[in-house]
Curated annotation (Swiss-Prot):
Annotated organism of origin: Mycobacterium leprae (strain TN)
Catalytic activity from the UniProt record: D-sedoheptulose 7-phosphate + D-glyceraldehyde 3-phosphate = aldehydo-D-ribose 5-phosphate + D-xylulose 5-phosphate
Name assigned to this protein: Transketolase
UniProt KW Transcription regulation keyword: no
Subunit organization: Homodimer.
Length: 699
């Protein structure tokens, strides 16, 4: 437990020479607004916003290069509040700095329809770079932002001296004890060191208090030493009021261009609340009227007034608007000089900012003849990437140590990273395109989000579908933000085979389809895979993340597949003898490797004079977004005899087959065997589909 003497020492102010009384008043105003806002809401997190007031003020008013009038400015520094529970740390700065929030928004904290929700939300509040709240995600995504910054520099201004390009900027992060405890930050921080991300500066709010109180009960490591071991540049600043130490640490971090920087800032949560300071009660609850009043007295505020902001304080802090405009104008001159020097790269930037694809980008997409050699859809995906890679320099990505299995490597490109990490297999270049995430699936998901949020490139990452479980928090957050991340998930069923049930996805398709706004795309063959990539890349901006689900095993190249049908999510692959004058007797709906089973079953049923429609349904989400007229044309409401076939749990198919339909599925874990044996033993055969069809017809 921190002693009273330590608290006294850690709360002694140290201000730079140009710090004024107005600056101190602004910092105290931040503290009072935090207590008032949480008190009015009845819940929230006041303590961190109080103790981090000097840091937040120093960053927003004295450090960050940003423009309140243009929060999408290409040259801005990025700020990530990984400690999203302390949303007031960010909201109050957005108010003081003139980014669009007003005092009434602070008063409306955590209420219906407000622009100040409990945790910061991307697009919901101007000036928020990323949705945070699930701890660890922000720091991990900031690693992606730093990687994106370097890659984009390579696209647009690779020959500029360090710090001399209009594309050079910093990524600042505030992380909490909780962030540090989350595993995703360990994964991402390790990779950040490998990548030598000198543009990433992380402030660790080391207050040693969480909801359950003193973190001694859960966190006893030397965190600074851990980050030194990763290979970060590490500094320790004693005291949250130590603005001199904070600014010196920032200057030192900027000078350490060969590695990311970690600044451990020892703060006292809830300062200067008289009785709840340095307690868990200051972390996640309103302080109470008496404590708020006492805090105001300590700071020289009228305890009977709420949300009090001196006119000279807001005038002073809104000076950031003019300073930001001036910084933007200086940058604009550098940018225009660059544009004159680099017209071709400027044209590329314009295309990417307009979110357009170049003419003919898909002209070389591979096409496979029906009944040609069978091919795994993961292999087809790899062929697609290598075909479109030369035309889409904005597309980059890799795998969580499964590149050869996921087929995620674009042919003939370097790996992304400092040349010193090159191996016999891979040549690394600062601006390479192939990403090596290592066995860090969770970090990969968050890093992909950071890359896409930073903009304007497109990033993808691959692993086995079973390991999407490790990525789920990042995938959900990407879906919440509606950002265009691409996940390549291969080895998509018991068809994985001999590795056995630990690696065989069973419930994963249903679990992923349960995530709102995530599109789960499972193509039936090589051509549907190419069509899926075309659709994914051609969709409009902010269409949400996509999971591309691919087979390990080879599958036939089918007749009748088409790009428009894939783009619509589901379509009639074959009608088995029916015509407009005759509806099918039964509809077989299938995805992925099971479409071939439906096609084979259709032929067997035709021998029995049963008219069968086969519907390929690569993406349920895309299909359900189509007009009713189209959906009814594919699945006529008058045909209630329906069978769905998918090598996963049946959970999501009931709504399409109805109460009278049947689902050929797997409701248990698999075993270690070759995929042919598993499919046969688990009933994924044409004969099993025929039996299901006959049963629904009998009913």
């Amino acid at each position: 437990m921190t002693t009273l003497d330590q608290i006294s020492t850690l709360t002694q102010p140290r201000h730079p020479d140009d710090w004024t009384e107005i600056d101190s008043a602004a910092v105290d105003t931040i503290r009072v607004l935090a207590t008032d806002a949480v008190q009015k809401a009845g819940n929230g997190h006041p303590g961190t916003a109080m103790s981090l007031a000097p840091l937040a003020y120093t960053l927003f008013q004295r450090t960050l290069r940003h423009d309140p009038n243009d929060t999408a400015w290409l040259g801005r520094d990025r700020f990530v509040l990984s400690a999203g529970h302390s949303s007031l740390t960010l909201y109050i700065q957005l108010y003081l700095g003139g980014f669009g929030l007003e005092l009434s928004d602070i008063e409306s904290l955590r209420t219906w329809g407000s622009t100040t929700p409990g945790h910061p939300e991307f697009r919901h509040t101007k000036g928020v770079e990323i949705t945070t709240g699930p701890l660890g995600q922000g720091l991990a995504s900031a690693v992606g932002m730093a990687m994106a910054s370097r890659y984009e520099r390579g696209l647009f201004d690779p020959d500029a001296e360090p710090g001399a390009s209009p594309f050079d900027h910093y990524i600042y992060v505030i992380a909490s004890d909780g962030d540090i405890e989350e595993g995703v930050t360990s994964e991402a921080s390790s990779l950040a060191a490998v990548q030598q991300l000198g543009n990433l500066i992380v402030f660790y709010d080391h207050n040693q208090i969480s909801i359950e109180g003193d973190t001694k009960i859960t966190l006893c490591e030397d965190t600074a030493a851990r980050y030194r071991a990763y290979g970060w540049h590490v500094q320790e600043v004693e005291g949250g009021e130590n603005v001199v130490g904070i600014e010196e640490a920032i200057a030192n971090a900027k000078a350490a261009t060969d590695r990311p920087s970690f600044i451990s800032l020892r703060t006292i949560i809830g300062y200067p609340a008289p009785t709840l300071i340095n307690t868990g009660k200051a972390h996640g609850a309103a302080l109470g009227e008496d404590e708020v009043a006492a805090t105001k007295r300590i700071l020289g505020f009228d305890p009977d007034k709420t949300f009090a902001v001196r006119e000279d304080v807001i005038t002073h802090t809104r000076g950031l608007i003019a300073r930001g405009k001036e910084a933007h104008e200086r940058w604009q001159l550098e940018f225009e000089a660059w544009a004159q020097r680099e017209p071709e790269r400027k044209a590329l930037l314009d295309r990417l900012l307009a979110q357009q694809l170049p003419d003919g980008w898909d002209a070389d997409l591979p096409n496979w003849e029906p009944r040609s050699k069978e091919l795994a859809t993961r292999a087809a995906s790899g062929a697609v990437l290598s075909a479109i890679g030369p035309k889409l320099p904005e597309l980059w990505g890799g795998s969580a140590d499964l590149a050869g299995s996921n087929n995620t490597t674009i042919k003939d490109v370097d790996s992304f990273g400092p040349p010193s990490i090159s191996t016999d297999e891979y040549t690394a270049h600062w601006y390479g395109r192939t990403l090596h995430f290592g066995v860090r699936e969770h970090a990969m998901g968050a890093i992909l989000s950071g890359i896409v949020l930073h903009g304007p490139t497109r990033a993808y990452g691959g692993t086995f579908l079973q390991f999407s479980d490790y990525m789920r928090p990042s995938v959900r957050l990407a879906s919440l933000m509606d950002i265009d991340t691409i996940y390549v998930w291969t080895h998509d069923s018991v068809g994985l085979g001999e590795d056995g049930p630990t690696h065989q996805p069973i419930e994963h398709l249903a679990a992923l389809r349960a995530i709102p706004r995530l599109s789960v795309v499972r193509p039936a063959d090589a051509n549907e895979t190419a069509y899926a990539w075309r659709t994914i890349l051609a969709r409009g901006a902010n269409s949400g993340p996509v999971g591309l689900i691919l087979t390990r095993q080879s599958v036939p190249v089918l007749e009748g597949t088409n790009t428009e049908g894939v783009a619509r999510g589901g379509y009639v692959l074959g009608d088995g003898g029916s015509s407009e004058a005759k509806e099918p007797d039964v509809i077989l709906i299938a995805t992925g490797s099971e479409v071939q089973l439906a096609v084979a079953a259709q032929k067997l049923l035709a021998d029995k004079d049963i008219i069968v429609r086969v519907v390929s349904m690569p993406c349920v989400e895309w299909f359900e977004s189509q007009p009713y007229e189209y959906r009814d044309s594919v699945l006529p409401p008058s045909v209630s005899a329906r069978v769905a076939v998918e090598a996963g749990v049946a959970q999501c198919w009931h709504k399409l087959v109805g109460d009278t339909g049947k689902i050929v599925s797997i409701e248990h874990y698999g075993e270690s065997a070759d995929y042919q044996t598993l499919f046969r033993e688990y009933g994924f055969t044409p004969e099993a589909v025929v039996a299901a069809a006959e049963q629904v017809l009998d009913n």
